[in-house]
């Protein structure tokens, strides 16, 4: 939506997080939604929401209270008489790379078929043609590009690392976090973060139950004849079609799986006890 601020029209994007069946947190991103106007470090404002009947009362950081209710187009702001005076339209965001087709020569790791499940140790198809978390590819890769799609569950009563947690381990060595981080800051242990190494440039996480994408271009670490590392690994990653790490140097492996080595590595989709699922996983070797 556009609002007036200091005499100028300014775009504001809102993301609403469910914290239970009746409590919510709203973050207003001044400039637009993350990746569509708002950039890390720009202004945000938060409000706490409480549902009573069909009315949500929002209390802002400075104590102001506004009331709203759901309408067909989104969130309707209401006056003291319960009349809708304005509407914040709901936006359904979709990754630019959702449904990307593997190019000729790609290694298709999972396409929903029973045969492709066999490409993974502990591979298991669930909910029809989706790949369950906690599995690793049998094939190993050096320099490569990868596309995959993932979906986190709706867990409104969970918090932090217990909310839709999994992870995509490049070569089984470098974890790119998978988590329901919708509306959060985007830290290195949240969705899109490279665990313990780098936070994403912008938090592009979509709401839980939305299909999301990771696309990366990875160059493995290089070693000399004596097995000494002479060049760190590097990676560029897109989350939902937006670059969140741009030619990032990876100085070391991340915790939880395999150490760095002068050898190809597998794709590991971490199991963390939450029902995260994957689909459309393919690799292009470089």
For the regions a language model picked out, list residue spans one by one.
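Mature N-terminal, pre-catalytic/accessory segment of carbohydrate-active enzymes
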Residues: 2-12
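Carbohydrate-interacting regions of secretory-pathway proteins
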Residues: 10-11, 17-286
